[in-house]
Amino acid sequence: MRFSGSPSPGPSNSSRWWPLDAGDANTSGDLAGLGEDGGPQADTRNEELAKLEIAVLAVIFVVAVLGNSSVLLALHRTPRKTSRMHLFIRHLSLADLAVAFFQVLPQLGWDITYRFRGPDGLCRVVKHMQVFAMFASAYMLVVMTADRYIAVCHPLKTLQQPARRSRLMIAAAWVLSFVLSTPQYFVFSMVEVSNVTKTYDCWANFIHPWGLPAYVTWMTGSVFVAPVVILGTCYGFICYHIWRKVRGKTAGRQGGPAEGAGESALYRGVLHARCVSSVKTISRAKIRTVKMTFVIVTAYIVCWAPFFIIQMWSAWDKNFSWVESENPATAIPALLASLNSCCNPWIYMFFSGHLLQDCAQSFPCCQNVKRTFTREGSDSMSRRQTSFTNNRSPTNSMGTWKDSPKSSKSIKFIPVST
């Protein structure tokens, strides 16, 4: 990398979306001047490592595009009412597709051609969009977790124009991601990386010696550290709130019902049976979405942590040797950061089984899967209705309720509106 104000170019370019690239230490040779025969040194690289990088990026791109496109297709075709969680899943899938097309795909082409092939303006746009996709994926995860925090810890606020608030949060994540990634236009440009071979590449320029560490630290903090802190705080409050609710319900059961309640207690219990069941169902749905979001956050941290550790190490350690970056053990973890965009779609489908069913409906070859899901769903619904009719719903099965020895003919059952 070449630092502005430094006497000579550094050893590495920045073909990755960051100013540092663990896989491009092989460019140090073309900056050394003349070869052993006195002629210009060839512009070469570690071809074995380059092939490995190309293969990994190609697999990540294909899997990310297929997975996230399937989720978007399933959300579009689902006959169910769209929820706020579906809205966040849709935009997180769009952010993951942005990672695939704006970050992984340009890097794949760049690794194939070795040097950036394009004008200075295209160099700046590509670098901007690569970092924009990183910001969008991270910040969309933050707003989705914030929505789960509001739904669990402040449920009354969900009644106050929840759709409008969710759309504002999503729009803020997109706009903030675009704004925070604009410095890439001023950091990167087409630079002559060899005075001998007259080779140009898309490189970053920094003020020596503090520019590079400051930039990498800022990007690490804004893309990784700050989101992880916010996510951890939200989940801390969510877990504490759920723990308090569980403890309160346990204490209530231990107290038991008051004696002498008589027919009025039975009457109230009958009237509110469906309401209590609905509340329990909503609570289970919230907990399921909280679990799904937690798994997504964990996958984000696991995939991105090695990348940021390598970047911070290479920026702050003065003894860092660029020869070490030619080791696949150092280069591949930096590439696997984008693997997070491949994991998210399967997490959605695991926690929302109907998404897989709705996606299967779009492909004729998956009609057997569709019929299996439909048959299992019908059997499950039939079992639930039978159990509810025989045991819990006197308003739907008068005969069963009258046969009970504990029933009272003086009780009048009023239909409960749902």
From Swiss-Prot:
SUPFAM superfamilies cross-referenced by the UniProt entry: Family A G protein-coupled receptor-like
SMART domains: DUF1856 (SM01164)
Positions of modified residues (Phosphoserine): 404
Keyword field contains Phosphoprotein: yes
Pfam families referenced in this protein's UniProt entry, alphabetically: 7tm_1, V1R_C
Annotated glycan sites: 13, 26, 195, 319
Coiled-coil zones: none
Lipid attachment, kind S-palmitoyl cysteine: 365-366
Residue numbers on the Extracellular membrane side: 1-51, 110-124, 190-217, 314-331
Region (Disordered): 1-20, 377-418
One Gene Ontology term, aspect cellular component: plasma membrane
UniProt keyword terms in alphabetical order: Cell membrane, Disulfide bond, G-protein coupled receptor, Glycoprotein, Lipoprotein, Membrane, Palmitate, Phosphoprotein, Receptor, Transducer, Transmembrane, Transmembrane helix
GO biological process: cellular response to hormone stimulus; positive regulation of vasoconstriction; regulation of systemic arterial blood pressure by vasopressin
Topological relation to the membrane, as annotated: Multi-pass membrane protein
Cytoplasmic side of membrane: 76-87, 147-167, 239-293, 352-418
Biological function: Receptor for arginine vasopressin. The activity of this receptor is mediated by G proteins which activate a phosphatidyl-inositol-calcium second messenger system.
UniProt protein name: Vasopressin V1a receptor
